[in-house]
Amino acid sequence: MGGIPNYSLMIDYINHCGDGASADLSAFQFRTKSATNRFIKAVEDCFLNFKSDEHKSLFLSALASNDFSFEEKLVVLYWQIVCCNNLFREITDNVFLRALYSGRSSIAKADVEAYLKYIKAKEPEELNWSDSTIANSASKYLTMLKKFGFAAGTLQKEIKAPHLSSALFVYLVKLALTVYPDERTLANPLFRFSFLDNQSIITRLKTIEYIPLWNITQIGSDITITLK
């Protein structure tokens, strides 16, 4: 995914073909048939796997909606690849978010490489990559963060956490409860990728504007969310 030059192209493709409909791929101006096939496979593997029809509808509707800006749609893409791609999710959780939540202002390629080498040593059957493949993958991961709008710079990537608008926050809550319907608390795995701490999530969940959307039950620090 790091090799795709423009993520607006990816959004256009998903809007044309995400529901299984065929489209005239000549509009996407790939130089070769093999480049077209690589693009399609990358998008389908990373973004077009769904837990349910409701998940699929929620994601495709968000990308097609005029209620989200392009920058917000990039965040929607980020949450979707977190749902679809185990390795991206693991790197993000253990490298990018760990750096963000610990107060670091930047991450480097070496951070990602070190984590990939750790996975290789721990689970060689899962990640039997050469050092050059690991280095290339680390570079592509940071490129993806930059294209999502979460990083800036060249060697040392400055971390740029996005602001979650009301529309994005509502989407996140609905997505979390759709993908993990049995996890209606703050332990829902997707909340880890929200760029918000638990208290900030609770505060926003209780905001008056969201009363028509969900019910909140709180006992101590435990909170349960039920969509209306």
Task: Please report, for each region that a protein language model flagged, where it lies by residue.
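Eukaryotic partner-binding/assembly regions in large regulatory complexes
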Residues: 1-98, 107
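Short amphipathic alpha-helical interaction segments
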Residues: 31-39, 131-147, 196-207
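Hydrophobic, Leu/Ile/Phe/Ala-enriched alpha-helical segments that form helix-helix packing faces
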Residues: 43, 47, 116, 205-209
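Amphipathic alpha-helical interaction surfaces
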Residues: 49, 98, 118-122, 144-151
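Alpha-helix initiation and capping sites
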Residues: 86, 106, 135-139
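Short, positively charged loop/turn segments that connect secondary-structure elements
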Residues: 103, 117-137
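Accessory, usually C-terminal, subdomains that scaffold auxiliary metal cofactors
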Residues: 146-223, 227
